Amino acid sequence: MEKLAIPSVSTGNMLREAMKNGSSLGEKVKYYMDNGLLVPDEVILDIVAERVAQSDCANGFILDGVPRTLPQAEALQAKGVRIDHVVSIEIDDSVIEGRMTGRRVCSKCGASYHIVANPPKQDGTCDLCEGELVIRKDDAPETVRRRLEVYHEQTEVLKDFYAKLGKLRLVDGGQSIQGANEEILKAIGAKV
């Protein structure tokens, strides 16, 4: 995150990169993500541990997308991965569904759009390269609903886990991006 001068370690980005590379790990990841399932803990933790050990994470990092389960949180603790703050962005499922199912990605250059918040000039066509805009499989409505079910079943318990450790910070996700960013920075004690 630029304001904090530390890297954002996004498991989603790392997993999509693994899928793009077509490795055996990438094929496993693709199966899970295409079906709205969580990627197994051991795969996620190996990827994360390798990433946070890199030199650009020496002064801190932001974990995005992990931990998602209580065993992952406990395993990160056991591996000595220090987590100072956990930010939970609170928002209604219907809003999440609308945001995710409205996303479109250029099949050629990877540019991102949203049919409501950031529509292309011409429906279905990338403004930058005129490539076709597609819906990622993990943004399909049925996949999004399944991911939300999995979140409520497996991930929501982490709020209690981190609250007991005094690390949980709740942020209203229904506000503007700028407002949410400012609230996050305040919640973790950064200067706004």
Where are these regions (language model features)?
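Glycine-rich phosphate-binding loop of ATP-dependent small-molecule kinases
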Residues: 1-192
